């Protein structure tokens, strides 16, 4: 099976992020087969075949063939290893370890893609046998996990190695990853009560130590927290040592509570009560070696605080009371280390007959044929995928831009938004989760709410006094990942002309800008000038910040909010007609 698609995406991403000056130091060369970029390489040069598309999703120019050509002898480099070693040789010596790490990430992604291809048919068949071949009729919290399985087999919209997970084997993926829809029991750790910070009731979920094979004497003075099986070995031992808990905390020999992984993998749903999710730290990384899937203890309280702010906003906006729901993320515990933590996420009640689809699953192939979006359109939108995507965009952009008016931008990407469909209700409702990485502008929040809720966050980056920080986050998450990616995706699948789909996004954003007001300094005016009418838009530089460069080299305060720019595909002049 060819790995060319991964290499093609890698080359386009490195070009967009200008790794080793691939964009800024290259000159264009026109050869008989098309355009190439020539990058000087010591006493030689590397040639990259490119094409220009208008509009393109975050690219002005992209790779058109999965290769680099060495100018001196015509040698073609056609593997990610060969390409990255050639480019890494041009990097600052301080950055070469990052290129070596990216080589490894590419190999992991290629291996995972091959594994997915080999198992796609069997997994979809198994889901169809269990839940039915039409996912529009998959209802309730248990069936929602099957959508996660479909979504986990898709590429990330921006990151070229998004399917890879650092340090995990194929056996690990089959046993614990959402794309295989496994079921497995949790491990448990008995922690001294005085070492555990907790909020909310955990006793009904967490068994006493004696029920897990530990001495009964630990029932007094110790409390248990769940541990992911992948964390229960050496990573846990190292965490206990770092937290000063070696010999004081005890891993129980007996597992308890079967769970099923959600799309994020580190979050699992209780098999017997799938409306309850447990977010558990994992000693792995996704979307870059620096993007570790642990849980910093301070983020737990931050997420709960943001949830309270969103509740206050929703109370002032009646149209969202029934249409935008929030998972409860106020119950959590930690023992002072990023591998010793748990967030207990409760889904809202009343979803047993609801079709709950993560936004990330819309473009996934359905077990019975077509896309998930097609089957949802058939059942809920009269067979019209355009009506479906317009309804989704209307709800998403109304919510996101309303929050901008309050000085809030959420990191609600395609994995954190679930579409809720019920018979006889207009359009999808939204279910939101994971609120720990927003940007909040205190002055705008105070002006809109009439008061300023407590903004005492563990992460000082949450509070900003810069409108640009809000708009950058809104653009890179809501516009690119939750809207633009689906316009380009549906067009790629032949569902509608791209210009029509982009027009829907533009129209909904323009409506939102008008509703926010267009006076000087208003958020509506900024939305128009810095998003709708801007020549270029911020784009996440995920490979640079997450893998290629250490933080001190990239200057990234937050690797998930480190940006380059790309052409604005929403400009009317960019429509290909």
Task: List each model region and its residues.
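Conserved kinase catalytic-core helix
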Residues: 388-406, 410
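Hydrophobic residue at the +6 position relative to the catalytic HRD Asp in the kinase catalytic loop
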Residues: 417-419
């Amino acid at each position: 099976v060819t790995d060319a698609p991964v290499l093609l995406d890698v080359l386009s991403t490195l070009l967009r992020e200008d790794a080793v000056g691939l964009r800024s130091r290259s000159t264009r060369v026109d050869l008989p087969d098309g355009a190439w970029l020539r990058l000087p390489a010591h006493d030689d040069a590397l040639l990259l075949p490119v094409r220009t598309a208008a509009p393109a999703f975050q690219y002005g120019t992209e790779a058109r063939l999965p290769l680099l050509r060495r100018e001196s002898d015509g040698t073609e480099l056609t593997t990610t290893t060969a390409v990255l070693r050639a480019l890494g040789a041009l990097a600052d010596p301080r950055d070469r370890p990052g290129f070596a790490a990216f080589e490894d990430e590419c190999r992991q992604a290629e291996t995972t893609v091959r594994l997915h291809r080999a198992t796609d048919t069997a997994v979809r068949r198994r889901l169809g046998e269990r839940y039915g071949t039409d996912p529009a009729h998959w209802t309730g919290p248990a069936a929602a996990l099957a959508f996660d399985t479909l979504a986990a087999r898709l590429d990330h919209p921006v990151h070229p190695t998004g399917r890879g997970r650092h340090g995990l084997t194929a056996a690990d993926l089959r046993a614990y990853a959402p794309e295989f829809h496994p079921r497995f029991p949790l491990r448990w750790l008995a922690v001294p009560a005085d070492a555990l910070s907790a909020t909310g009731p955990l006793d009904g979920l967490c068994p006493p130590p004696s029920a897990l094979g530990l001495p009964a004497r630990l029932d007094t003075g110790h409390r248990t927290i769940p541990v992911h099986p992948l964390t229960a070995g050496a990573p846990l031992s190292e965490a206990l040592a770092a937290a000063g808990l070696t010999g004081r905390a005890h891993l129980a020999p007996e597992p308890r509570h079967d769970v099923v992984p959600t799309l994020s993998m580190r979050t699992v749903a209780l098999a017997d009560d799938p409306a309850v999710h447990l977010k558990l730290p994992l000693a792995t990384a996704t979307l870059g070696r620096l993007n570790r899937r642990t849980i910093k203890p301070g983020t737990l309280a931050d997420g709960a605080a943001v949830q309270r702010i969103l509740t206050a906003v929703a109370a002032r906006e009646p149209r969202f009371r029934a249409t935008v729901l929030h998972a409860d993320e106020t119950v959590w515990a930690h023992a002072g280390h990023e591998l010793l933590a748990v967030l207990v996420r409760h889904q809202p009640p009343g979803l047993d007959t609801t079709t709950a689809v993560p936004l990330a699953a819309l473009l996934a192939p359905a077990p019975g044929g077509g896309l998930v979006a097609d089957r949802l359109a058939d059942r809920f939108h009269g067979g019209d995928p355009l009506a479906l995507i317009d309804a989704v965009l209307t709800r998403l952009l109304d919510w996101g831009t309303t929050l901008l008016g309050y000085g809030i931008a959420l990191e609600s990407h395609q994995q954190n938004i679930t579409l809720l469909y019920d018979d006889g209700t207009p359009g999808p409702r939204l279910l939101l989760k994971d609120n720990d990485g927003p940007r909040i502008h205190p002055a705008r929040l105070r002006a809109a709410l009439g008061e300023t809720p407590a903004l005492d966050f563990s992460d000082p980056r949450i509070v900003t006094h810069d409108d640009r920080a809000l708009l950058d986050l809104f653009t890179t998450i809501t516009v690119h990942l939750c809207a633009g990616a689906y316009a380009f995706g549906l067009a790629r699948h032949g569902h509608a002309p791209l210009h029509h789909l982009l027009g829907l996004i533009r129209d909904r954003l323009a409506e939102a800008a008008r509703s926010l007001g267009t006076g000087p300094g208003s958020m509506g005016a900024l939305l128009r000038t810095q998003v709708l009418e801007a020549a270029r838009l911020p784009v996440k530089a995920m490979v640079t910040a997450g893998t290629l460069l250490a933080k001190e080299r990239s200057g990234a305060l937050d690797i998930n909010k480190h940006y380059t720019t790309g052409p604005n595909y929403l400009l009317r002049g960019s429509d290909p007609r």
